Swiss-Prot record:
InterPro entries listed in its UniProt record: Phox_assoc, PX_dom, PX_dom_sf, RGS, RGS_sf, RGS_subdomain_2, SNX25_PX, Sorting_nexin_C
Gene that encodes the chain: SNX25
Membrane-protein topology: Peripheral membrane protein
PROSITE patterns reported for this sequence: PX, PXA, RGS
Protein transport in keyword set: yes
Name the UniProt record assigns to this protein: Sorting nexin-25
Amino acid sequence: MDKALKEVFDYSYRDYILSWYGNLSRDEGQLYHLLLEDFWEIARQLHHRLSHVDVVKVVCNDVVRTLLTHFCDLKAANARHEEQPRPFVLHACLRNSDDEVRFLQTCSRVLVFCLLPSKDVQSLSLRIMLAEILTTKVLKPVVELLSNPDYINQMLLAQLAYREQMNEHHKRAYTYAPSYEDFIKLINSNSDVEFLKQLRYQIVVEIIQATTISSFPQLKRHKGKETAAMKADLLRARNMKRYINQLTVAKKQCEKRIRILGGPAYDQQEDGALDEGEGPQSQKILQFEDILANTFYREHFGMYMERMDKRALISFWESVEHLKNANKNEIPQLVGEIYQNFFVESKEISVEKSLYKEIQQCLVGNKGIEVFYKIQEDVYETLKDRYYPSFIVSDLYEKLLIKEEEKHASQMISNKDEMGPRDEAGEEAVDDGTNQINEQASFAVNKLRELNEKLEYKRQALNSIQNAPKPDKKIVSKLKDEIILIEKERTDLQLHMARTDWWCENLGMWKASITSGEVTEENGEQLPCYFVMVSLQEVGGVETKNWTVPRRLSEFQNLHRKLSECVPSLKKVQLPSLSKLPFKSIDQKFMEKSKNQLNKFLQNLLSDERLCQSEALYAFLSPSPDYLKVIDVQGKKNSFSLSSFLERLPRDFFSHQEEETEEDSDLSDYGDDVDGRKDALAEPCFMLIGEIFELRGMFKWVRRTLIALVQVTFGRTINKQIRDTVSWIFSEQMLVYYINIFRDAFWPNGKLAPPTTIRSKEQSQETKQRAQQKLLENIPDMLQSLVGQQNARHGIIKIFNALQETRANKHLLYALMELLLIELCPELRVHLDQLKAGQV
């Protein structure tokens, strides 16, 4: 950074100061050092102020909303004839040229006052002179240039031509070697710095392009069902992530080799980077999966992570691996330890609130340990994407390879320390066998066993938490309450099972009759309700078991409808119905008549040899809670099987778990998102995309697709990806890149660029047509897939046309300039308010 800034200062001093000052004085050396000292002080002041700017907010919210307002105003001003056009209100400084200059002078004076060294600020004449130079020689010409549609069109053509050229280059970028390892060897053995710099650039371009490529169709996962095409999409996404990782490794190797050969140090502050001359020229690349699977490799990787102060990531991954292979009775203790070590005491593994709630649910036994698998997968991706590329170019990796070679020299590598990859096919076979066994067993017995296990788990968890150094009182209290609920749930299930057994054992011997009825009021509406007594009359006429259930008339009608779907003859049976006349109350006569009709209906059902076996009838007469009963007579026209009744209960029926409202839960590395939403930062971007491409009804779909794309491609929330992208855009490496572009534009090959020639209207018109044609020919496939081909085309034309009006461009530039300068120098706001007040 310092070197790049120094070059710009030297060129500026040579061409803008020394060119005239050298003829007036021979003391240019002293002036150079004085100005250089002031230059560095200005740079420090600028850096200090920029460090207090919330760059993510400015870029993602303020700038994007300014662009959104600009396009909305342009759209309103260009309304169709049948609509009322709205005048496009320009920035206040664009009323006339004098107001424009005054605005720039005000900005320049505040900038000079804020950034000049304290010793120079005292001089009023110096401040005025520098502000005038900044206004007339820098800001005004820059605004005129950037708002000129012809210049914009020329830049568009140049960038598109450059992109086509680079596309041709990168097609040949990886034809140097037949395999990835050979490509790495080629980098490590090459001694041409310029070749390596060009190769590094091509790799960076490839990384940028690769991260934007993904399959948009079928990104959404359907619960419990995946199509072959969906699996292919996920496979492509996984391979793309591996490809990006390989590119990142190649880039690191390229930078290391350039540094060894005396070229620029692209990554000077990389911890653990090899010193010059270290390491073999040809290096073996261990795959990340192999490093984690091998204890010896993982130990060295853990040492590197400790150096990076991220040892907790490896420790968490290892703890979850241990949890996967633990005995059932060890799980509560291990879960408690993981919770205490990583989420309570150190909090080194930061997760979103939704995942944290799942962890607490797992801790108390309401959910399985799958949440830890999910977090482990995200930690795995973080280790692979962020730390693996730098690890394999570190001194610790070099030492690992040396030790590995020594082992090979003395003996064959022992497999005892190897932790082989999990046999997924074997697991699936075991799962299939287990599922078959479970299907053959009685579901009710299995569910009772699950409740007993859950109860035991919660008791162990309670004991583990109570014995912890810092027991969480809320969780302890919650566990005690849940243990009471599970005990009650178990009692209900046992009673339900016993009652079901009685029913099955005595089919055809049950009787049901309505003993009484009453009128209840619900939501201001009168409803008839009946009390049905169900009894079992054994031989000898002695009633041994009975119970009473309240049922509304609507429930009788639902039972009639369900049974009629299976037995069409029941449709002829008429049940009582309420009068549809308004304000007609339910009288005693109706209650008596309906009671008799319903009694007859029940007796007919129970006396029928087939209908008395109906699951729907048993569920209607059973006093068990609704969550213990599932009725599904659809599609079972003439078949009734009470034995399968309990087996068709959903497996999570007895778990009172909080439903998560968010579907895109993932590891945010890392911190909660703004406003508790995973796309809060992207909201203005979504609105801008919707406005430019006129999505209307497609807006929600595009929003979900973008979130899914970022999740699949980068393995993180869109908020996290936006933060990382903005941080990368304004990183030191990219700032150096921008400064070098500025330097090369003003001083190509170290010489001041000649003034541009004035172009004719014909030339400008030809450039405009070529630029529009090129833009339409180069619409990214990703954009067309996202918003549709026609919408993409119309949106590109809208953007292009918006840039063809000089005054509209100036308006946007001044709006953005005011926004950014106020963020940099808040003092400017008062001066601009005074200026606007004086113009009114």
